[in-house]
């Protein structure tokens, strides 16, 4: 990058990350420019949250148009644009309905709550489990952290939320073994959390063979 070492943050900003001493001032598409005018190819994309690129003309105009009308009214009221987007998304996917969230962690947290709700209802409150993959990453809330198959991220935040067991990614035999163990112990599997592509785990792809085998 041409920069050495980390950048100290302002004392008023909570220190959570070691940051590069780079401050970006503008972006266009997949490109960024720092305060010195140096150009960078942005392969990080806000940790995969800016997939449309920076300063996208269509997105920018849509946001400005909406901000001039209504900024936020919550789910207490009918939101026509939200309903239209949900219809579009269900047409393009296998989903029958959608639940809009602000982040991946919130989406996974909601998924975990839905699985737990289903498990407690279906299994009459009996011990039910959620299976997740080793080397996975599902977020930094306490529940998603508990579902993350990497102890290094859980260190210092114990105890984790109970009810998770982990299998080897792309290993259907490992999954079947967990199911057998749960059945033997009188436990029920209420759901499975899995990433089609593991990012934190090393950009690992979930193979079609594993999917065809039943997961």
Task: Label each residue range with its predicted role.
Residues 86-191:
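PLP-dependent aspartate aminotransferase-fold enzymes
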Residues 5-6:
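Short, positively charged low-complexity motifs
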Residues 206-215:
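Single conserved hydrophobic/aromatic residue that forms the stacking wall/gate
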Residues 56, 134, 193-196:
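Short, small-residue-rich loop/turn micro-motifs
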Residues 67, 156-160, 196-198:
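Gly-rich Lys/Arg/Thr-decorated short loops/hinges at beta-loop-alpha junctions or inter-strand turns
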Residues 186-202:
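Short acidic, glycine-rich surface-loop motifs adjacent to enzyme active sites
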Residues 9-97, 208:
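N-terminal glycine-rich, Lys/His-bearing helix-loop that initiates the first secondary-structure elements
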Residues 46, 69-70, 172, 196-200:
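A short, flexible beta-alpha/helix-coil linker loop
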């Amino acid at each position: 990058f041409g920069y050495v070492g980390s950048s100290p943050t302002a004392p008023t900003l909570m220190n959570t990350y070691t940051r590069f001493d780079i401050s970006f001032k503008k972006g266009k598409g997949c490109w960024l420019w720092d305060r010195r005018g140096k150009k960078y190819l942005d392969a990080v994309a806000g940790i995969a949250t800016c997939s449309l690129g920076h300063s996208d003309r269509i997105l920018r105009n849509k946001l400005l148009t909406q901000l001039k009308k209504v900024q936020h009214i919550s789910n207490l009221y009918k939101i026509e644009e939200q309903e239209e987007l949900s219809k579009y998304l269900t047409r393009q996917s296998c989903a029958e309905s959608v639940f809009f969230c602000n982040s991946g962690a919130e989406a996974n947290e909601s998924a975990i709550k839905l699985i737990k709700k289903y498990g407690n209802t279906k299994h009459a409150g009996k011990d039910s489990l959620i299976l997740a993959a080793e080397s996975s990453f599902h977020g930094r809330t306490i529940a998603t952290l508990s579902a993350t198959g990497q102890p290094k991220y859980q260190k210092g935040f114990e105890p984790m939320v109970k009810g998770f067991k982990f299998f080897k990614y792309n290993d259907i035999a490992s999954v079947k073994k967990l199911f057998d163990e749960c059945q033997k112990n009188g436990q029920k599997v209420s759901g499975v959390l899995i990433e089609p592509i593991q990012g934190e785990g090393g950009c690992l792809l979930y193979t079609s063979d594993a999917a065809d085998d039943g997961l």
